[in-house]
């Protein structure tokens, strides 16, 4: 990067717009090269050619977006630390409460919040992320988390015990499955009933808390992959796209073919 800046300082005027543009396209703005990106952006902005100057403005915008993202995520980590002097704070969230088919899945995650220069950028409510971004982040989270655990209840359990019971149960099991016992558990939405530990609930926690957001992401990716596998066995329900939710294609298939073993019969009373 330093060599590129040196080269640009010496030869920018002799480079065509296309050459400069191609060089800029190859650059990835990240936490390790912010100072160099700023220097390069300033250099390009000073160029008398408007199209080259605009590349500098674009590079500066990308840098500012990164800085804003760092600040947003840092605040999520600080939120987790704001509850007191707890060493290990876990976040727990679920996915799959509303679908007509498939399990309800919960994940619990403990992050290392001691180094705010080593945070996981772009974490958020899993529903706000693209499928590709969720999958990418899920791997990063599992690699960097101090501990994580995933739990689920299948459709049979949901029919037998009710979705509310199963929602609470997967929260408990995910927390109990952690290799590190959390000093505090932050749960998305509501308190965990009959939980043997300290617990605080956070409304819309997956947008406020780093550990809840991470739990949301790995739970979503895990469940989506389960439903994609079911799609191979039951292709007519389009599980790969709807992951069990009641889309028109899914409901039409239910009416034409009937339910499968993974459908929640207690959810189908108003459909069949």
Swiss-Prot record:
Enzyme class: hydrolase
GO annotation terms (biological process): DNA replication, removal of RNA primer; mismatch repair
Location in the cell: Cytoplasm
Keywords: Cytoplasm, Endonuclease, Hydrolase, Manganese, Metal-binding, Nuclease
Keyword Manganese belongs to the record: yes
Cofactor binding: number and manner: Manganese or magnesium. Binds 1 divalent metal ion per monomer in the absence of substrate. May bind a second metal ion after substrate binding.
Chain segments annotated as transmembrane: none
EC number: 3.1.26.4
Binding site for a divalent metal cation: 93-94, 188
GO molecular function, one term: manganese ion binding
NCBIfam families: PRK00015.1-1, PRK00015.1-3
Function: Endonuclease that specifically degrades the RNA of RNA-DNA hybrids.
Family indicated by similarity: Belongs to the RNase HII family.
Protein name: Ribonuclease HII
Organism, scientific name: Clostridium perfringens (strain 13 / Type A)
């Amino acid at each position: 990067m330093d060599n590129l800046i040196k080269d640009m300082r010496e030869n920018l005027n002799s480079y065509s717009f296309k050459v400069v543009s191609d060089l800029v396209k190859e650059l990835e703005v990240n936490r390790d090269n912010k100072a160099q990106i700023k220097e390069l952006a300033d250099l390009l902005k000073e160029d008398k050619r408007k199209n080259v100057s605009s590349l500098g403005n674009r590079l500066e915008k990308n840098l500012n977006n990164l800085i804003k993202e760092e600040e947003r995520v840092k605040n999520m980590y600080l939120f987790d630390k704001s509850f007191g002097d707890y060493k290990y704070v876990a976040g727990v969230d679920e996915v799959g409460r509303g679908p007509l088919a498939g399990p309800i899945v919960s994940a619990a995650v403990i992050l290392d919040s001691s180094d705010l220069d080593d945070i996981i950028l772009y974490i958020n409510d899993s529903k706000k992320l693209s499928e590709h971004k969720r999958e990418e982040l899920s791997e990063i989270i599992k690699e960097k988390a101090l501990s994580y655990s995933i739990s689920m209840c299948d459709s049979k359990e949901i029919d037998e015990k009710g979705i509310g019971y199963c929602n609470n149960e997967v929260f408990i099991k995910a927390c109990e499955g952690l290799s590190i016992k959390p000093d505090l558990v932050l749960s998305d939405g509501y308190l965990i009933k009959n939980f043997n530990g300290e617990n605080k609930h956070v409304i819309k926690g997956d947008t406020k808390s780093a550990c809840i957001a991470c739990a949301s992401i790995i739970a979503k990716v895990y469940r989506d992959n389960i439903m994609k596998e079911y799609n191979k066995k039951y292709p007519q329900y389009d599980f790969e796209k709807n992951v069990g939710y009641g889309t028109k294609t899914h409901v039409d298939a239910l009416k034409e073919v009937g339910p499968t073993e993974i459908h929640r019969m207690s959810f189908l009373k108003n459909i069949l």
